[in-house]
Regions:
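Glycine-/charge-enriched secondary-structure boundary and capping motifs
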Residues: 1, 16-23, 74-104, 108-191
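Glycine-rich anion-binding loops of enzyme active sites
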Residues: 1-62
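Short, acidic (Asp/Glu-rich) active-site segment that either coordinates a divalent metal cofactor
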Residues: 35-95, 99-100, 136
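Structural signature of the urease/amidohydrolase superfamily beta/alpha-barrel
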Residues: 46-49, 188-192
Length: 192
């Protein structure tokens, strides 16, 4: 007797056959209204903290599949075996990791560190999970209507490192920097 509302329908073009099924899981949280974070509390001068991602997380995989050339390859064929071998080779651009390993890095889950911050009384005004659309499209969900954010990345000294797998796929896809920022998390999985 529980309505599961919201969310999205997963699409798997070129991945799943008609008889295949997708098993997914999710969690739902409950919070007392006085403890809810409210974007209205975000004010000019607040600092945005970005928590690092482990790679592409769960977004941009349609583009990734095009870049790595796996669309249309039937599982169990010699072509599939050759592609698997190719994707398993270490790449210098990925610090010696294979593209397969870099793309399959598990999505970082932020629950524990966020709960520690909140329970410790840290003044967190809002949180934005950086998913499809990147920082460009997701940060606005955590801002008051009358507040804008300015995010700059000036390299590791004053910003953060973009995971090599994101740089690699963006370059292979010939994405302009602004398009890469709208497709991938660019190394930031969560903003506070």
């Amino acid at each position: 007797g529980c309505a599961l509302v919201g969310g999205e329908m997963a699409e798997h073009p070129g991945v799943m056959a008609p008889a295949d099924y997708d098993l997914a899981g999710f969690t739902v949280g409950v919070v007392d209204r006085p403890k809810m974070l409210d974007p209205a509390n975000v004010r000019p001068g607040d600092v945005i903290l970005g928590l690092p991602s482990t790679g592409v997380h769960s977004n941009g995989y349609s583009l990734v599949r095009k870049v790595i050339g796996v669309d249309g390859i039937k599982p169990g064929t010699p072509e599939a075996a050759a592609k698997a071998e190719e994707l398993s080779r270490p790449l210098e651009e990925l610090g010696g990791a294979s593209l397969a390993d870099a793309l399959l890095a598990p999505t970082r889950i932020y629950v524990k560190p966020i709960l520690e911050l909140l329970r410790g009384g840290a003044p967190v005004h809002a949180i934005a999970h950086i998913t499809g659309g990147g920082i460009t499209e997701n940060l606005n969900r955590a801002l008051a209507d009358d507040v804008d954010a300015v995010v700059t990345r000036n390299g590791a000294e004053m910003g953060w490192d973009v995971p090599p797998v994101i740089t690699y796929v963006s370059r292979q896809a010939e994405l302009a920097p602004n398009e890469a920022c709208k497709t991938f998390n660019m190394g930031v999985g969560l903003c506070l």
